[in-house]
Amino acid sequence: MSFKSIRLPLALAALVPLMAASTRAPLDLQPESKLTISGTSTVRAFQCQATSFDAKVESSGSSAVAAVLAGEKAVSSVVVTVPTEKLDCRNGTMNEHMRKALKVAQFPTVVFKVNGYELAKATDGVAVTLNGTLTLGGVEKPITVNALAKAGENGTLLVSGTQEVRMTEFGLKPPTLMLGTMKVDERIKVGFDVILKD
């Protein structure tokens, strides 16, 4: 076997990962996306909104939105990062206590990383089961998040859902305000409307 006949297959083999990488494409997070944290207390309910967050979503092709809506697993990775200081509860005192409870000074971000997922057809879209890890207050735990994906405006993909999280499971103490008369329940709900576009 000649040197040239060996070199050709080796060159082709070297191109395979490059070709695979070139087909990966990010899905862009749209500014209309929303993420909220809501809960109850001994006095009243509350809701905090993330004024800024990031979602890095990579797909295995250039038409991932259409593929996902068709029930195809076209997304290859998902990492959502929320700067905890960007949570706004529309109340200065509540903001201060919530940020203290989430240990913002030590752990400035909340991170959700998807390790695997399943899709299933639903009457109003595609049911999505996300299996991943949630890092909150410096503690990482496995979590399963259920969501619904459906077509949004202007060719976008809207992924919506609500997930309950217990603060104490992550070593966090729920906020207490008004000299202890207002105690926040340890169960908070994370709601999201993530809008993505090819």
Kindly give the residue locations of the regions a language model identified.
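Bacterial N-terminal signal peptides
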Residues: 9-18
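Bacterial N-terminal signal peptides that target proteins for export
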Residues: 1-10
